UniProtKB/Swiss-Prot annotation:
Residues 1-10 have a biased composition (Polar residues). It comes from Komagataella phaffii (strain GS115 / ATCC 20864). Its main location: nucleus. Regulatory subunit of the SLX1-SLX4 structure-specific endonuclease that resolves DNA secondary structures generated during DNA repair and recombination. Has endonuclease activity towards branched DNA substrates, introducing single-strand cuts in duplex DNA close to junctions with ss-DNA. Forms a heterodimer with SLX1. Residues 1-23, 37-64, 303-353, 553-574 are annotated as: Disordered. InterPro entries: Structure-sp_endonuc_su_Slx4. It is found in: Nucleus. One of its GO terms (biological process) is DNA repair. This is Structure-specific endonuclease subunit SLX4. Signal peptide: none annotated.
Amino acid sequence: MEFVSTQIQSAYEDYEEKERHDRDIKKKLASFKSAEFGHNFAEQTSQNSNPRKRKISEKSQKERPIRSLNAQVLNMFHGNVELIKQQRALLKVLSGKKRKVNEVLKHVENIELENSTTHRDKRKIAGTRINSSTFPDDFGEVLYTKNEWDLLINSIRIRFPRLSATSRKTLNMITEKYNERLHSAEVSIWDASSMPPIQLTSDDIRVLHDLKEDDETEPNELESISDTRSVILTLSQALKQDTSKIVEEEQNIEEVEGGMPLSQGVEDVPDSEPEVLAKNERSIISLNSDMIVQSSQVEPIILSSDAGTPQRRRDSSQLTQPLEEPILTTHLKSSPALSKHSKTPTSTQSPIKLPFNFRESTPAIDQLPSFLDDWRGAVVSDESQEVVYSTAQNHSQTKSSAYSTARSNFEDNSTRKTLNTGENEDSITVLKKTIVPFYGKINPEKEIVYHSIEENEEGETREIKSKLMDRMRLPNNEEINVIPDSESDSEHDVSFLEVISVVKRREPELEGDFSGFNTNLFNPPRQDTLISLDENDSEEVFRSQSQNYIQLNNTQDQTQDPTSKQREPTNTQLEPDNEVVNDEETFEKWKLLLKSNPEIYQQIVTFKPLFLSEIIKFLEANGFLMPKPKDVNLLKRFLDTQSVCFTERARK
C-alpha cells in the first residue's frame, strides 16, 4: 500500500511540474506579444499589453489575415521602425531555423578570411599590442584554419546527410547526434568481438569449414571419375593434385569386387580418342531407345511409304535399328556425335517413341499432339497422277502459307499449282486430297445430305445431292485411309478420313496463265485445328464443313471459260464475267505501283488498314481508271489475294 501511495504521489508531482511549466511558457508568450517587451519588462501591466484600437463601424471594419511572423510584428507595433528592428533581431536569436546556423558559419568564415598569421606578423613588426577587444590574445590559435574548417564541414555532411534547410535542423541537433555516435562507439566493441577478421588464412578457412588435411583420408571414402571427367572439373583437379593414384585405386577396387561399370557398353577412355567416344554415345542412344520401347504398352502404328494404307508392326524390337540402316526421317530426332574421320560433330539418328493409340487414352480435342501433322504429310497417294498434292513437301508448303505474313504474300505471290501441258487431251486429271475431321460416332440412321458440284466435258455444271451412306461408299477412283484405328466405345473418339478424290476439268483453250481467276471466297479452315462438338451439333457442322471443302476444291481449280453457261445459284453465288481479262498482268502492275509508294508500302507490311478510296485515286492517277463497280470488285479481290488490310470507309 505504501508503494502504491508513493507512486501516486510521484505521478501527481510530475503533473504539477508539467502544469507549472506550461503556465510559464504561456506567460512568456503573452509578454512577448506585449508592446514594451525588452524595454520595461518588470513594469509592464495588463493594461499596456492591449493597445487601444480606433473605433470603426462594423461595415467598414475588415481585418487582414496574419499569414507570417513579420505581419504579426507589424500589426502589433504599428510601423515603429526601431521596435521592429529590435524585435526582428530578437526573433533571429530565438528562432531555431537554419539561417541561424548560416549566420554563425558566415561570421566565422569572415574572420578566418583575415589570416591569423598575418596579424601575428604585424604585431611582431609593430612591437605594440593590438586592442584586445578587437583581437584577443589567443586569436589564430583557437579558431580553425580554412582547410580544417572544410574538413569539419565535410565530415558533418557525411555523418548527417539529412541536415538541410527543409528539415529545420540546428547545431544543437548536430551535437545530440554526435553524442549518440560516441555512445554507440562504446557499445560497438561488443559487436567487434563476434566478427572474424576480414582476411582469412588457409588455416582459418580449414578450421572454419572443418576441412581435412591433405594427408587425412578415410578408408570408406571412394572417389569415382565418370567418362566425362574432361568436362567436369573435380576438386582434386582444381587444387592441381595428381589424380593418377586415385584412378589406380579405383581400377583395383573394380577388379577385386567385380563391380559393373557405370553404363553398359561404354568404355572409359582418355579424351584423345574421339572414335571411342562416338561409339559410347551411340551405345547410350541405343540403350535409351530400348528402354523407351520396353516401357511403352501401346502397339505403335507407322505409315509405310510403299502402300496407301497404314501398316502395323508386330515386333516392337524392330524399332531399334542400327545406325547404318536407313530410317524414316519423319520419325527420327538427331543427336550430335563425332564422326570417325573428322572431329566435327555429325548428326546421328535415333528412333523415338511413336504416337500412342487412341484406344488407350484420348486427350483433349484442343490439346492433340503435333505429330498428327507428320502423319498427314506421310500419306502417299497414287504415283501415276501427274499433279500430286499429298506429298510431305507440298503439305509443308501449304502449311507454311497459313502462317505467312502480308509482306511475304505481297512480295512473292507465286502459284503452287503445276499443270500437265505436255499432253493434248480434252481434260486434265488433278488429284485433290481433303482431310475431313469426324468428331464422335456417325449414326447411320440419321439422313445427312451433302451437296457437291460436278462439271462435265462441255463445261456445264450441276448440283448433286447424296446421303451419308452413299457418301461413305466411295467409287473406285477414291480411297479412304483411316489413321489411326477409330473402332472405340468412347464418345469422344477421334478419327481422320483422308479422302483423295479425282476431279476432271477442262483445259483452258486460250493462251496465257489464268491462275489469277481462282476465286478466293474464304480461307479454308486449318486442318490441324480441331473443335470439340456435341453429338447433337455434329450433324450440321459436318454438313457445312464437307460442303465448304467440296466447294473450295471445285472453285479454286476451275478457270473462267467464255463459252460456259451461267451456273446455278449455290451458297457461294458465283457470277463469272463474260469478258476475259488477263488479271494476272493487271495485278502485277498494281503491285509494282503500290510498292513504288513508300507510305502505302509501309502500311501494307505493318498491317495497317488502307482506305479503298485513296487506293482508287492513286491508281487512277497512274492511268488505271475504274468507272464500273466490277473494276472496284477486281481491286478488292486483288487486295484479298495479296493479304492487304483495307477499309471502305472514308477518312475522317
